[in-house]
Amino acid sequence: MKLLTSLFLLSLVLCVNSQGWLRDSLDFLNQARLGAGDMWRAYRDMREANFKNSDKYFHARGNYDAAKRGPGGVWAAEVLSDAREFLQGGSSGRGVEDSMADQEANRWGRSGKDPNRYRPKGLDPKY
């Protein structure tokens, strides 16, 4: 009887302590969704701006905006950035050095540092 009571109390404590897992999971997924949207917006803006030497700025800005969403946004930014660089591979014609520079801009933005470090002079202020 004591064993049964102990197991019941232990499971009750574990259940009470785990009540936040669903909310935390849903928050993470929402942050990831919004972060992916931030990444898409930066990509769309980069294509629209079509401004020479601005890609690093948009990499940093997309990652920065996504990371502000929280851990889910950071995760989405990292996954999308890594996937883009992996899929693009050498097809951009710019080589490994450019890919490494893109990843540095990605990390800079994800770490919460100002993406304007990479902003080229003359880029339209709307970006």
From Swiss-Prot:
It holds the Pfam family SAA. Major acute phase reactant. Apolipoprotein of the HDL complex. SMART domains: SAA. It comes from Notamacropus eugenii (Tammar wallaby). It comes from the Eukaryota. This is Serum amyloid A protein. Residues 1-18 form the signal peptide. The lineage of its organism: Eukaryota, Metazoa, Chordata, Craniata, Vertebrata. Keywords: Acute phase, HDL, Pyrrolidone carboxylic acid, Secreted, Signal. One of its GO terms (biological process) is acute-phase response.
